[in-house]
Amino acid sequence: MWVKLRISILLIISCLFGISIGNLLIVQYEANTFKPWEWKKPPMIINCYGERLSPNYINKSVDFWVMKGENILFVEYEPIKSLCTKRNTISNGVIKIYEGKDITFDSHKTLGLTKRKASITTGMVGANIYIRSGHYTIKNLLTHEMGHALGYTHVNIRGHIMHPITELMDDKFWIP
């Protein structure tokens, strides 16, 4: 009886240790890889922000990434109610753009935030972009967040579109 209990406890501890190591490796991989995740199929983009987010801003961001070799299935400029009402759900094959409320962000300095879901076996699954209310007009902000939704991470080089500080980013892009 005690032997079975000890083996069960040892198996549980081993599983928890394995999961922890796996998570640590994924975090390290994301931290040290410029584009850790790829879309297997081109995503569609849905404007869940609403009519205040002009198609011009979305098109500018999409065009930027398409010129860099990314593929987008299509852009839906009108909110799709069945998808957009699920603010905290990341939908498969979709990049949704939302108006972010102050509570969404961890700091008053954060203007945009992208939550993405990826799998080691399938790559990028989906992403939600949150732009702080009224800040979508800030140069390159939506393009930067769309970069995260497409699988890119930050680059700490002044002028790079993926620089983490808005004031230090520009419309330059290269793979470091």
Each language-model region and where it sits:
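Bacterial N-terminal signal peptides that target proteins for export
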Residues: 1-9
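Disordered inhibitory propeptide/activation segment of secreted metzincin zinc metalloprotease zymogens
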Residues: 9-53, 62, 66-67, 103-122
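Intrinsic-disorder/low-complexity coil detector
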Residues: 35, 41-42, 78, 163, ...
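Loop/turn elements at helix/coil->beta-strand transitions in domains of secreted/extracellular proteins
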Residues: 42, 70-72, 158
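Metzincin-family zinc-dependent endopeptidase catalytic domain
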Residues: 55-145, 149, 153
